[in-house]
Amino acid sequence: MKGVLLSGGTGSRLRPITHTGPKQLVPVANKPVLEYAVEDLKEAGITEIGVILGHKGREEIQNLLGDGSDYGVEITYIVQGNPLGLAHAAGCAKDFVGDDDFVMYLGDNILKEGVVDLVESFESGDFGAGIALQEVENPQQFGIADVDDQGNVTQLIEKPDEPPTNLALIGMYVFSPAVFDAIEQLEPSWRGELEITDAIQSLLEDGYAIDSHVVEGWWKDTGKPEDILEANQLVLEDKSLKKRGTVSDDATVDGRIELAESATIEDGAVVRGPVSIADGAVIKSGTYVGPYTSVGPNSTLEGVHIENSVVIGESSINTSGRIVDSLLGKGANIGSADDFLPEGRRLVVGENSQLKL
């Protein structure tokens, strides 16, 4: 079995962060979202991975993943070009996949339990496809699956007004090569895209059994700033955190802290976990780093009160103010203005931006 990892798309809902880079490289707990997907595929025994590239961020993604050897996998890069839908992206991998079954994994998704169970469920029978599902509170906003008592899919409906179930498709699929014939027969939807749900429905109509696996753990599509922050919370809550860096004697550190080897917490700083602090980061005197915060590499925080936030890296924050629920892009420089107000600020700041609060 092979893996097909989608890393295209414009990331419009994550602007301004994605004006300067692909959404799949935004870090969660100081690791790019795309790396979690590669690790999930490797955990499922998949070592041949095709990475679908769009127009944006090709070089950055290739620089991160390389040939895959750092992850114990072999990576082939496949250029999709214009984003014409998930089914179009899957179709671009036809030559790479050949006669093998494959997992298709949306590279901006992250889930607790990985894809091992999804793969094992698919391999337990004779299926044309397998889909990961999760119960949601707002099924009208998702593609929805109707399943029988054996877990076989009987119908797929895209964003129904009256959904028959609350089982939503969540961006992880397993396919046999038969899906490529289904894709070739598709017509663009009203969105002008080739829809993967239409391809799966075509397999159903052609007599293929479609497996389903209901995901019990958490899952996040990290398409918006608030989704990145929630994913950061979930990962920090579950992650095994290690302190390897330097903590000064007069610093206060409570709770679960991940402190990289070359990171420093100086005298007079307060850090309360769960928190992740990357290599080269410095938490200076008078700084409070509160729960569910990730401080990226080579960042310096001084005097600020920050919590439930992601600092992507190479940033300088020197302000006496309070920053909460914020996503701060690489190279952000935030300082104080004379009229700073005491209440917390919620910010989404793009790469290399400068602010005076």
UniProtKB/Swiss-Prot annotation:
InterPro entries noted in UniProt: G1P_thy_trans_l, NTP_transferase_dom, Nucleotide-diphossugar_trans
Binding site for Mg(2+): D108, D221
Coiled coil feature spans: none
Record's keyword annotation contains Transferase: yes
UniProt superkingdom: Archaea
One Gene Ontology term of the molecular function aspect: nucleotidyltransferase activity
Disruption phenotype: Impaired formation of the tetrasaccharide present at 'Asn-532' of S-layer glycoprotein Csg. No effect on 'Asn-47' and 'Asn-117' glycosylation of S-layer glycoprotein Csg.
EC number(s) given by UniProt: 2.7.7.-
Keywords annotated in UniProt: Magnesium, Metal-binding, Nucleotidyltransferase, Transferase
SUPFAM superfamilies: Nucleotide-diphospho-sugar transferases
A GO BP entry: S-layer organization
Necessary cofactors: Mg(2+)
Pathway of action: Protein modification; protein glycosylation; Cell surface structure biogenesis; S-layer biogenesis
Cofactor: how bound: Binds 1 Mg(2+) ion per subunit.
Role of this protein: Nucleotidyltransferase involved in N-glycan biosynthetic pathway that takes place under low-salt conditions (1.75 M instead of 3.4 M). Participates in the formation of the tetrasaccharide present at 'Asn-532' of S-layer glycoprotein Csg, consisting of a sulfated hexose, 2 hexoses and rhamnose. Involved in the addition of final rhamnose (sugar 4) of the tetrasaccharide on the dolichol phosphate carrier.
Similarity field: Belongs to the glucose-1-phosphate thymidylyltransferase family.
Protein name: Low-salt glycan biosynthesis nucleotidyltransferase Agl11
Natural source organism: Haloferax volcanii (strain ATCC 29605 / DSM 3757 / JCM 8879 / NBRC 14742 / NCIMB 2012 / VKM B-1768 / DS2) (Halobacterium volcanii)
Source species taxonomy: Archaea, Methanobacteriati, Methanobacteriota, Stenosarchaea group, Halobacteria
Gene for this chain: agl11
